[in-house]
């Protein structure tokens, strides 16, 4: 397990390890940060999937955010964590230069992708992980095939996102006994997700 970094944020010291472990220490009774430890950033509203349950409402007409904005990037602190998503974050034309800027600032990046994009864009995903442009990878599960299970095992910091109400219990059972990390998320009644549920 590799040390990613240590930093002081307000009245506490934080240590972050390569497996995602985070240790916070303070001599006080409460943690009082001076800046956000992590943030979610939706970098685009473009996606070619059109999943009926998607709460993001992203479409093929969706726009790409101005992620190379230096004014924003310069507000980020070393070892601050950002979770990138979209739409399809992997489709953003400035993704690699943006991630390189964040890496240069020692910002720790996690990214969420749809299972279909994860499988189709393996060359890009592998590059992002191998070059340490991202550390954590969230993959929104669509169909737990054997191919998917074997593929995701190659990413030690991958977490499978299971959306309650979208998948069947048998889909979750298919993941059992594979030594995989799983996060069960609540269903969001927003945008297309609201129509799908009703």
Task: Annotate each language-model stretch with its function.
Residues 154-156, 176-177:
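Basic phosphate/pyrophosphate-binding loop/patch that engages nucleotide-derived ligands
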Residues 38, 57-66, 78-92, 102-121, ...:
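Core AdoMet radical
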Residues 46-47, 75-78:
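C-terminal capping segment of individual leucine-rich repeats
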Residues 1-6, 174-198:
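A C-terminal junction/extension of Radical SAM enzymes
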Residues 29-68:
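Canonical Radical SAM [4Fe-4S] cluster-binding loop centered on the CxxxCxxC motif
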Residues 68-75, 98, 124-128, 147-151, ...:
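A general structural detector for well-ordered alpha-helical segments in enzyme core domains, enriched
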Residues 1-30:
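N-terminal accessory interaction module
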């Amino acid at each position: 397990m590799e040390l990613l970094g240590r930093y002081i944020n307000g009245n506490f010291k934080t240590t972050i390890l390569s497996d995602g472990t985070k240790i916070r220490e303070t001599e006080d009774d409460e943690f009082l940060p001076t800046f956000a430890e992590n943030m979610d950033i939706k970098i685009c509203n473009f996606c070619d999937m059109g999943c009926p349950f998607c709460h993001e409402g992203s479409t093929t007409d969706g726009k790409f955010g101005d992620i190379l904005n230096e004014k924003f990037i310069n507000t980020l602190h070393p070892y601050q964590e950002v979770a990138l998503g979209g739409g399809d974050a992997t489709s953003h034309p400035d993704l690699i230069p943006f991630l390189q800027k964040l890496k240069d600032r020692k910002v720790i990046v996690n990214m969420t992708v749809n299972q279909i994009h994860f499988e189709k864009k393996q060359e890009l995903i592998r590059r992002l992980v191998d070059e340490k442009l991202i550390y954590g990878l969230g993959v929104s599960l669509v169909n737990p095939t054997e191919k998917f299970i074997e593929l995701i095992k190659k990413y030690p910091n991958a977490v499978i996102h299971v959306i309650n109400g979208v998948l069947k219990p048998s889909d979750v059972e298919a993941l059992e006994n594979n030594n995989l990390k799983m996060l069960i998320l609540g269903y969001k009644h927003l945008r297309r997700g609201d129509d799908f549920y009703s």
